[in-house]
């Protein structure tokens, strides 16, 4: 592969066409790239690395003006170009469509074309699986599960009764969809009476769910995740939550029951949301924040309890001054007491 081929494939402008015959064998970060690797610059904080990188060339924005030790490939979206370059150089192996002899299929299962089912996977009755979907080993699909086309379900996932997946859904290892919601009636004698959880979970198209994440079935109706949303590892979504389109939930987010997340919302790592509230479209919440009330669209929030991000930064700065302020207050109290 030549550098000129990379430029042509990704519609990039090569700053130094005379280097077009330079060989390209892979992709790598700026700091570890070798003379045959393509790299990228998307975050300005790493601009200085352009002067020391050994990369064959680097994807940058068209308006980039800095110095570089290698040729530059100018594209509108360097990070996206880099991602597609990875796909090009490291294509994913296509599984051989087959049903492993140790897999167990229930009655009236409907399989689409080129479906793959791995070893020791158990498929319940009346399950429907779309074309080209791959289900790895040791997965369990309970009765009446519906899975769309081109999905990838990695090992040890469990999909409970009536769970539905759209097309091109990715479930990383040990995802659990449709476990019972956490619902109990407190009794006068202190015991807790379990409320039957008879709803389900519905996942839209192009959703990816990270390893160890759990999404509980609705008490009645549906817990839903809309098209294009990405959920990181070890996230908890409780019963009757709804998550809009193209949202991002980072690792260890926890949503209590009946939390409603809008479209294009970003919840950073370990954000927690109390139940029965709404987080409006395009809202961004910083890491470890606690959301205790509904948030309007286009908000920027942080802190516990979550507040406007600008106020949160001021409060955080003020907290660092508290020890000195406390000393000053004590001195003033001592003077007043004299």
Swiss-Prot record:
Q: What is the lineage of its organism?
A: Bacteria, Bacillati, Cyanobacteriota, Cyanophyceae, Acaryochloridales
A GO biological-process term: lipid A biosynthetic process
* Organism, as annotated: Thermosynechococcus vestitus (strain NIES-2133 / IAM M-273 / BP-1)
| MF terms in GO | N-acyltransferase activity; structural constituent of carboxysome shell
| Assembly and binders | Homotrimer.
- Identify the pathway: Bacterial outer membrane biogenesis; LPS lipid A biosynthesis
Recorded hits in InterPro entries, A to Z, give: Hexapep, LpxD, Trimer_LpxA-like_sf, UDP_GlcNAc_AcTrfase_non-rep
Matching CDD domains: LbH_LpxD (cd03352)
Catalytic activity entry: a UDP-3-O-[(3R)-3-hydroxyacyl]-alpha-D-glucosamine + a (3R)-hydroxyacyl-[ACP] = a UDP-2-N,3-O-bis[(3R)-3-hydroxyacyl]-alpha-D-glucosamine + holo-[ACP] + H(+)
User: In which domain of life is the source organism classified?
Assistant: Bacteria
Q: Which gene encodes it?
A: lpxD
Question: What's this chain's function?
Answer: Catalyzes the N-acylation of UDP-3-O-acylglucosamine using 3-hydroxyacyl-ACP as the acyl donor. Is involved in the biosynthesis of lipid A, a phosphorylated glycolipid that anchors the lipopolysaccharide to the outer membrane of the cell.
This enzyme's EC code(s): 2.3.1.191
Where does the record place the catalytic residues? 239 (proton acceptor)
Q: Which GO cellular component term is one of those annotated?
A: carboxysome
Pfam family membership, one: LpxD
Tell me which UniProt keywords the record has, alphabetically: Acyltransferase, Lipid A biosynthesis, Lipid biosynthesis, Lipid metabolism, Repeat, Transferase
Specify the protein name.
UDP-3-O-acylglucosamine N-acyltransferase
The similarity comment for this entry is: Belongs to the transferase hexapeptide repeat family. LpxD subfamily.
């Amino acid at each position: 592969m030549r550098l000129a081929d990379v430029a042509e494939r990704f519609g990039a402008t090569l700053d130094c066409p005379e280097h077009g015959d330079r060989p390209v064998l892979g992709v790598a970060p700026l700091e570890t790239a070798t003379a045959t690797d393509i790299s990228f610059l998307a975050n300005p904080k790493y601009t200085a690395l352009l002067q020391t990188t050994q990369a064959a060339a680097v994807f940058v924005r068209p308006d980039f003006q800095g110095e570089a030790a290698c040729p530059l490939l100018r594209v509108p979206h360097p990070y996206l170009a880099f991602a597609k370059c990875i796909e090009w150089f490291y294509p994913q192996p296509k599984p051989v469509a087959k049903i492993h002899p140790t897999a167990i299929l229930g009655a009236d299962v409907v399989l689409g074309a080129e479906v793959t089912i791995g070893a020791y996977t158990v498929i319940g009755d009346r399950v429907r699986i779309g074309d080209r979907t791959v289900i790895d080993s040791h997965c369990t699909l309970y009765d009446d599960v519906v899975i769309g086309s081109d999905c990838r379900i990695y090992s040890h996932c469990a999909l409970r009764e009536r769970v539905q997946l759209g097309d091109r859904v990715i479930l990383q290892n040990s995802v659990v969809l449709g476990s019972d919601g956490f619902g109990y009636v407190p009794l006068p004698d202190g015991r807790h009476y379990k409320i039957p959880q008879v709803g389900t979970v519905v996942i839209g198209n192009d959703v990816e769910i990270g390893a160890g994440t759990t999404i509980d079935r609705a008490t009645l109706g549906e817990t839903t995740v809309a098209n294009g949303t990405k959920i990181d590892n070890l996230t908890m979504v409780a019963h009757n939550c709804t998550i809009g389109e193209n949202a991002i939930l980072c690792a260890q987010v926890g949503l209590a029951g009946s939390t409603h997340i809008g479209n294009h919302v970003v919840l950073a790592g370990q954000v927690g949301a109390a139940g029965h509230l709404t987080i409006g479209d395009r809202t961004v919440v910083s890491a470890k924040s606690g959301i205790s009330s509904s948030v309007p669209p286009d908000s920027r929030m942080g802190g516990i309890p979550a507040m406007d991000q600008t106020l949160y930064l001021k409060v955080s700065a003020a907290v660092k001054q508290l020890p000195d302020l406390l000393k000053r207050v004590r001195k003033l109290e001592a003077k007043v007491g004299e």
